[in-house]
Amino acid sequence: MPQTRVSIFDTTLRDGEQSPGCSMNLTEKVRMANKLQDLGVDIIEAGFPIASEGDFAAVRAVAAQCQNVKVAALARTAEQDVARAAEALKYASHPRIHTFVATSDIHLEHKLKKTRTEVIEMTRAAVRQARDYAEEVEFSAEDATRSDVDYLCEVLDVAVEAGASVLNVPDTVGYTTPVEFTRLVQQVRKRVVRDRDVIISVHCHNDLGLAVANSLAAIEAGARQVECTINGIGERAGNASLEEIVMALHVRADRLPFETGIKTTELYPASQLLSNIVGFDVQPNKAIVGRNAFAHEAGIHQHGVINNPLCYEIMTPESVGVTANSLVLGKHSGRHALALRYMELGYDITPAELDVAYKSFTNLADRKKRIYDQDLISLLSSTARAAA
């Protein structure tokens, strides 16, 4: 089955940095941007230039440094925002201005204090201004999933008429569900895009733990750009995780016939670099890049993995840049894993010695959360003394 290309829009440096405790200085942003370029993302959203001098400088530095990737700068639908974004992107080889305004009634009434008509005019003016500066303009309808669908489509249509070539449909507060989001993307595709050369993008937050599921549903419904972050960092509960989306498409190509330009073997190194920069480790059981993603403790699982890793792994550790899987020795481990670990440590033990060592091992594992190699060596010494 032929595969359809989906663009990866990485917003680690912009939305990701808004995650509490995840701020980066200019040097760190450039370092991370270079890694993202090596990873093969299509677009790097480098920051929000009007927000601060630091953000402006970071966008300018990333734009100058990363010449083999599109670089985007965020701007509200305000004249000074768009002008500042354009200035920051001055040295980009492939610049994109990403302008946005909210379209939900709750945002219009309580945040913007604007009427629907005023927001339409703001959209038209900002996109036109952005097109004067950049060949490529992306428009986002903030809080799209809580917006009136008829009004949302009206605003998006105005953005296309004004020159936007990418329409982003954000689930700003992580409110939607996969079935609901599928219908919304289909509506935008049918009523706004039609036969025009316009890309539908999605940007999902993880407040209900559905960011990746919603992103994949949107791709199936016709979205051809997905916005995401390394390790899923971002506002509140975070964004859709880049590595999870990419590997879902990679592993389930039978069900999801889509491809990206991501070098999957660079996923784990990119995750580790980000963690080192922000000092914010991913949870151990995080899919794809967590410490336990390829770790096995249960004895039945360990036996299967020893015989053939595919018994309990749907991808190889090496495919995402992890050197090997890990058999974690703990209270649920079996004899096969213990015997293998002794062999790796250079010990050739008999079945009888293994029986004695295993009994001592299970007793120790009931008392200790982690078993170290020195513990295993000590157990063997105790076994030898008992035999003597």
Task: Describe the function of each predicted region.
Residues V6-I8, Q18-I43, F56-Q65, E79-I200, ...:
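Alpha/beta enzyme core
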Residues M1-R5, T11, E17, V71-L74, ...:
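Domain-level signal for soluble alpha/beta catalytic cores
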Residues L13, F48-P49, L74-T77, V101-S104, ...:
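Short, ordered loop/turn segments at secondary-structure junctions
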Residues R5-V6, T12, M247, R255-A388:
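A mid-to-C-terminal "edge-of-domain" accessory segment
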Residues I43-G47, K70-A73, F139-A141, S201-H203, ...:
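Short catalytic-loop micro-motif centered on adjacent basic/acidic residues
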Residues D15, P20, G209:
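An N-terminally biased module of ancient metal coordination in phosphate/nucleic-acid-related enzymes
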Residues M24-T27, R31, E53-A57, Q80, ...:
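Conserved active-site and cofactor/substrate-binding residues in soluble primary-metabolism enzymes
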Residues T176, R183-N308, Y312:
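Catalytic alpha/beta core domains of metabolic enzymes, predominantly
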